[in-house]
Amino acid sequence: MKFVDEASILVVAGDGGNGCVSFRREKYIPKGGPDGGDGGDGGDVWMEADENLNTLIDYRFEKSFRAERGQNGASRDCTGKRGKDVTIKVPVGTRVIDQGTGETMGDMTKHGQRLLVAKGGWHGLGNTRFKSSVNRTPRQKTNGTPGDKRELLLELMLLADVGMLGMPNAGKSTFIRAVSAAKPKVADYPFTTLVPSLGVVRMDNEKSFVVADIPGLIEGAAEGAGLGIRFLKHLERCRVLLHLIDIDPIDGTDPVENARIIISELEKYSQDLAAKPRWLVFNKIDLLDKVEAEEKAKAIAEALGWEDKYYLISAASGLGVKDLCWDVMTFIIENPVVQAEEAKQPEKVEFMWDDYHRQQLEEIAEEDDEDWDEDDEEGVEFIYKR
């Protein structure tokens, strides 16, 4: 299946149903009074995270989602039916952005999580609501309010503990194949990896972590060179980044300059991402003898001003890989994810005596005069007292 990590959609909540103007007409009850019912609330539009999905490709073709309108009120104090909600299922890891405001509405980070993205309109009031001691035959009603309408940008961001950084052909995919059951394509030409992939690294029966491989970066990626930086967003939720450096590039490029390019492109994309913990990992040390590899790695680290620990591995032969993975596992255990508090979603209600309806009644009351019935030509026929 084609991997699609961005999609734009339109969501429209249902309008509220209008209130009804009606009077009770029944045999032997000549002055039945008002019995117009309220309208129904409009349906809402929800997002729901589904772990069985792994791409947004469906929303490249289906771009509009509309909830049902609330039914109008009816006579005999019948309230209109509430409009049906629409639920849009997205992969776990999807970020929802309002394109109109640029606001991030929410991150769908766990299976079954729901997010309200468009609220249905409020119902209108029937004329029964406007009955009072001075207005026995009200002919007022209110219409339902429009539902929310939004253009949303959906961004799928892979949920991984560890992210891989590096130039094309640095050995990122080979590393993923060596430590997990994932089988990304590996070849001796740049940009073999065209889409992100995930691998689960199992250290033992109880300990494991997820590593993400993204296409390599080149100079000018922030301006769109190569595959650009569109895949860097998949590293935003990672707890640690492994910066793979080809210690002996086959194309004769300078490893120090290659590393600086990656750091520069990372900073151009996001200062927050650049500030994440980043480990230096020298790959392909099997191409050199042990002493030469150690000396070259030390020289590169000094040229980069790197003072922390660095690792020497060979993803192809497995040399040094296990020790690196155990250190990563220890780091992940010692630095658990801080879960953001999930926003409480409003509950569905069939009727809510809210500020909107209260304001509508007050506006009608202000327009009434002290002698309401004299302004109503047919009012005498409907006035009654107990």
Swiss-Prot record:
Question: Which N-terminal stretch is annotated as signal sequence?
Answer: none
Instruction: Enumerate the CDD domains for this protein.
Output: Obg
Set out the biological process GO terms recorded for this chain's protein.
ribosome biogenesis
- EC assignment: 3.6.5.-
Keyword Nucleus in the entry? The reply is no
Tell me which SUPFAM superfamilies the record gives.
Answer: Obg GTP-binding protein N-terminal domain, P-loop containing nucleoside triphosphate hydrolases
Q: Which domain of life is it from?
A: Bacteria
Instruction: Give compartment(s).
Output: Cytoplasm
State the InterPro entries in the record.
G_OBG, GTP-bd, GTP-bd_Obg/CgtA, GTP1-OBG_CS, GTP1_OBG_dom, GTP1_OBG_dom_sf, OBG_GTPase, P-loop_NTPase
Q: Binding residues for Mg(2+), per the UniProt record?
A: S173, T193
Positions of the OBG-type G domain: 160-333
GO CC annotation: cytoplasm
Keywords carried by this UniProt record: Cytoplasm, GTP-binding, Hydrolase, Magnesium, Metal-binding, Nucleotide-binding
* Polar residues bias locations: 129-145
Gene Ontology molecular function, alphabetical: GTP binding; GTPase activity; magnesium ion binding
Assembly and partners are described as: Monomer.
Checking NCBIfam families in the record gives: Obg_CgtA, PRK12297.1, PRK12299.1
Q: What does this protein do?
A: An essential GTPase which binds GTP, GDP and possibly (p)ppGpp with moderate affinity, with high nucleotide exchange rates and a fairly low GTP hydrolysis rate. Plays a role in control of the cell cycle, stress response, ribosome biogenesis and in those bacteria that undergo differentiation, in morphogenesis control.
Q: What PANTHER family does its record include?
A: DEVELOPMENTALLY REGULATED GTP-BINDING PROTEIN-RELATED, MITOCHONDRIAL RIBOSOME-ASSOCIATED GTPASE 2
Return the protein name: GTPase Obg
